[in-house]
């Protein structure tokens, strides 16, 4: 039974990716507002009802890549090594992302990645939808921080929520600054040293204000 469940889940994830990548390709070619849900369904060779079983809105078709990262910060905190604090784990993870030129850090100069970011930040409805994803990232991280605090009888849930909001905001600002510089013509490798310096400074500031998680 578990094998059948795993197979179904893999098929489901493949369908998610197929529909989303098809949609993103169309959005990049024509523009978000010029592509209908029916266009995406036809290109992906699925019916509209099937498409809506996977994606609740047109915006979600474009933001599926962000959905993959929605609980990333929470997973980093829960998966940290013994003796590592939540903030240390998040700092390490972000710096590792910079080294890999992970698109989520903004430090990626691949033409398709840059085009996707232009699509995202140039489409008001996508920016608004992204705000909801950010909120869920904060909620997931707050829950993970609260769990970490309980392990050592630390601060209450409201403190965890405040901390999560600050951490997610810092990561977003760092990523947007990296993307802004790369979009202006700098290479990812050229921006990398400054990106690391900015990240180190930002996490130092977080440590001074978020002592329970540092």
Which sequence ranges carry the predicted segments?
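Basic, helix-initiating cap at the start of DNA-binding domains
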Residues: 1-46
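HTH DNA-binding helix-turn interface
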Residues: 6, 30-32, 45, 52-64, ...
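Hydrophobic/aromatic residues within well-ordered alpha-helical segments
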Residues: 15, 69, 94, 133-137, ...
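Hydrophobic alpha-helical connector segments
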Residues: 72-116
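Short secondary-structure transition hinges
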Residues: 111-139, 152-153
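Hydrophobic alpha-helical bundle segments that form small-molecule/ligand-binding pockets
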Residues: 135-164
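C-terminal peripheral helix-coil segments that are non-catalytic and often amphipathic
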Residues: 143, 147, 176-214
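Alpha-helical transmembrane segments of multipass membrane proteins
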Residues: 168-172
């Amino acid at each position: 039974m578990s094998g059948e469940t795993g197979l179904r889940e893999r098929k489901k994830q493949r369908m998610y990716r197929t529909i989303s990548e098809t949609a993103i390709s169309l959005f990049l070619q024509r523009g978000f507002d010029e592509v209908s849900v029916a266009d995406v369904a036809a290109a992906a060779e699925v019916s509209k009802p099937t498409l809506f079983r996977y994606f609740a809105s047109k915006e979600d078709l474009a933001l599926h890549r962000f959905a993959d990262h929605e609980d990333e910060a929470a997973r980093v905190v829960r998966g940290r090594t013994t003796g590592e604090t939540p903030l240390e784990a998040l700092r390490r993870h972000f710096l590792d992302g910079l080294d890999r030129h992970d698109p989520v850090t903004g430090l990626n100069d691949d033409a398709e990645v840059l085009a996707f970011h232009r699509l995202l930040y140039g489409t008001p409805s996508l920016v608004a939808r992204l705000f909801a994803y950010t909120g869920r990232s904060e909620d997931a991280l707050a829950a993970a921080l609260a769990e970490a605090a309980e392990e050592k009888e630390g601060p209450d849930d409201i403190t965890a929520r405040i901390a999560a909001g600050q951490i997610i905001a810092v990561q977003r600002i760092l990523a947007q600054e990296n993307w802004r510089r790369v979009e202006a013509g700098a290479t990812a490798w050229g921006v990398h040293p400054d990106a690391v310096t900015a990240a180190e400074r930002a996490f130092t500031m977080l440590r001074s204000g978020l002592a329970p998680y540092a």
